[in-house]
Amino acid sequence: MGILSVIRIFIYCLIRLFSFNSRKRNSSIDELERGEINAFACDKQNTPSPNSECRPLTPLNSPFRRTVEGDTANLQAPSPTACPSFDSASSIKSSKEDIACRKLSTERFFYSPNGIDEMKKQQQFKKIPTVSITEVEPAFIPSNMEQALFSEEPFVIQDDLSHQINLDDNRKFSRIQKNKLDPLITVNLVPIVNGENCFNFYETQMETNFLSPEFIKKPSMVDHKRDSEINAVTAVSADGSFSPLTETLSSTISTLSNDSLDGLSSQKNEFTGFNSNSEWIPNDTVDYICNSDASSVVSNLSDFEDCFDQFGVYDKEYEKKIEKTKRNFPKFQSSATYPPFSAHHQARRNNPQGFRNVKKRFQLFKDDCTALTDSDFLDALPFFNARVIIALYVEWRLRVYETMIIKGEESLKNLQRARDGPHNKLWLGVFGNKDTIKKLSNYDRRAISNPYVSNHLNFNVRRVKSDTVYIPTILQLLRSSTQLMTEQAFVASSNLKSTKGLRETRLIQKYKVKGDFEYVYAALYYAAFTQESTLKAVTIDDILSEDELEDWWYLNLRYTSFITPQLCFEFLDKEADSCRDRLTEVKSEPPKAVIYEEPLNKLSRFSSDRLFTSHELVAIAELISLNEPPLESGKKFYYEEFQKACQKKRDDYRYSPEIEFKAAFREKFLQSNEKVPFPRPGEIYEKRCDYFSKYACQNIFISKPLKRSGSIYEVFSDGIGRVIYGSVLDYEATRNNILLHFGFEIHCAPSEEELIEREEAFKDFHNMLSFKYSANEIYEFCGTHSRAEVHKNEVLKRMAYYLIDENKEISILRRILSLRIVEPTTSFTRYEYDLWRTFYPDVLYLNYSKSGRIPTGSPYIMNGQWRKDLCVSTPPMVDINSALFPHWFKLSASNLFAGAEHAGLNRQKPDKIDLDLYEPLPENSYLVAAELRVLRALRHKNPENIPLLEKWEVRALHQLMAKIRKYYTVPTDYLSLRMDGLQAMLRKREYMSCYTFNYFDYACLMDHAYRLYEGFNNQVVNLPPRIM
């Protein structure tokens, strides 16, 4: 029995010993993962209980204390997560969710090939910077921390530092005694002076007393000596400079210089912890700096509702101005340097419900950042400083960009898992066919928009045919891109001298629009500029229209296209300072009148032959012919009237002889009745003796004889032309007469030798339209990609239709319409084209719209442009029979592809073309509208495919929306709503420079594109454009 009892006691001691060690080890590991202790320093001392009731609440012992992350932490936590509650008063009690939230923020995304071991290794060498002592007002400074502030080695925060502070030491360094501290104050906070906590203040019952003088007056300066001592050891943030929200709003100190940090610290000390009666107030709004997350560009968004008004800090440098001019203090009180604008307070009081709605929307910032829209930031302008909204907007774009990256990676993993599964219904349910499975398993490299992936892929093994290309799987792409990003991040961390976050340096290039106009970004910058230059609050109504705002943006491009907003703030500070000087200092001298030259009056220096087009010359002759000139001096009369028209054009560039002729004709012959339709030009020329003077009918407008001999084609063309279009004039003789009367030289027709040379140049032209093509010519049309064979069939089919169409009646009517102009044909010269365009520009325009090709004479034929146009007219699933489709098609293509760069690349031989740089697609082999290509591709894509869009495709869809609104009238509200929905979806992703869509967004995008494509072809294209 004695032996058994000894064994039991021994086992019991072992159990107690192991359980104690494991419990201690688990708690240490948990604290280490939460970032609350260091891996090396775990100095446990005899400290008071953490739950001591008499211990004053300071930011160091706050349950929501978070250390500032360093370089490695930025790599580990590239995206901030949900943070503690918005109510600063409720942030006193901790919860398991908050601890798990902080744990998740450090473990969310850790790009490391070695996993947890690498994480622990980096955790040991992680540099934890010091806490800003000036922000911790009554805290005790330990001796080792005091030494570390003046040494070069990094200071290490010991474990449970907040619990090691003695109550006596804390009372010694504090300005308040224990008996003066009311426990109710720590729960129900009094609003701090100058609106530092006014975000929560408006939900209290003290709204009427906030703007009273006792809250507005300047706080007293207490103990300047101690303030200067503490300011001398101010700890700087991780990147060497403050974030936009924590910077001072001074107009004289640069927001980029480190010199402004001392002023910010001293100004912060003036407002932190004391009211006007020099009594200490527990300010838990100071906690937002200590609780900052270095993985965020805006480092204090944990309690961002306080940061809105904390951004405007009292500026010491304005004390001298106030003392010199007491009368300017009310104006200074409402300026941009005084926190915050009185107009913002007034807007919150006048519209409390709108202020609550904005506040409620911004609460989604941390919970679900994708639920916010760009309009929310514009709605917040009446209530907050525009600079703060810019900083929040930049942070929002960055957060949503990272969120979309995460969703894109998850969708790629799910897609690869579905492709590898045995029940593979994703790829059309094909089983057993090895060739088909091999083709479908190839990953389309054109869908890769990740620069790390595209740089990492080895394209040297690529061959001419796409079926034999080596393309890695999606998991290999993810693995390689992750490793490459990790390697580049480590290289960047070693090269950076400062402790700026890797997340900011790596991603800030992506979400910033470098010079490109973006409406919300430009509107916020314009609001900040207006707010600080006029010293007034800005609302949405004060922002310019989109066209005017775009002009303002590019006019100030050197200020608005920087990488970070601080550079623009520096410019705004200078402008605000100069505007304040102009407002406060009254100058006795009157301003000088600046006379600007009219930029649109360039026609005043033009000669007479450059003022009007050929069609306008005909209109001037018709206008003069309405009145009978003297028979003896007919040419002199026409010349003098023409010089008067030239003077009108020089005086007013908007002068149009066509409009003036129609008005004079309607007044003389139609009794100014607007309801009577205006006669066609052919009708006027047929009855010209009834309308024009006798002199004009005899000496200017010459009739051509009726054609009675020749081929049946020529006779039939002349008759139809007279009946339908009134082509009864001898156009060549009429134009020459007009030029002679106006003092110009006549245009000579081409000689027989020139016509013979031209015919010889095109003797084999029609033979080129046959089906016999060499391999190089087919490659020139279609390229070498996998869809080249399909597109080649479409091109040849269209050529067959073109040959058949020439034998139809419509071909004869086109020839009659345009004086044998049907493109391309050998019976057409530039002389005939210019002659017809002189009298019938609208008819020629309609003919050009129907044909879709440009009849510009020999260069059009010699350069092979007709073949390019023939390929342009063969995009699949496009209504090429609509009347105005080619006109819109040309507008689209000219804006996207200026010149023939893409076509020039396509004209190379297959053995010389560099497929790594350019692989032609059938839709953009020549100057094809990229908008139609994207819409067409979205219409036929399966939503299960990889949802990636290239950047130029998103911009092309934006241009499509703009062109439809600019050139056409959208008839139905349904189509307009579709356009708005598509544009809003694209704009949200283009602002973030992120074009990765999840399944739901991609299906919605495809539905928008399909409906818009159908509605555009059925309703919009067939309407006349506005430019007509």
From Swiss-Prot:
It is a peripheral membrane protein. It is found in: Prospore membrane. Keywords: Membrane, Sporulation. One of its GO terms (biological process) is ascospore-type prospore membrane formation. One of its GO terms (cellular component) is prospore membrane leading edge. Its main location: membrane. Has a role in spore morphogenesis. Involved in the assembly of the forespore membrane. This is Sporulation-specific protein 3. It comes from Schizosaccharomyces pombe (strain 972 / ATCC 24843) (Fission yeast).
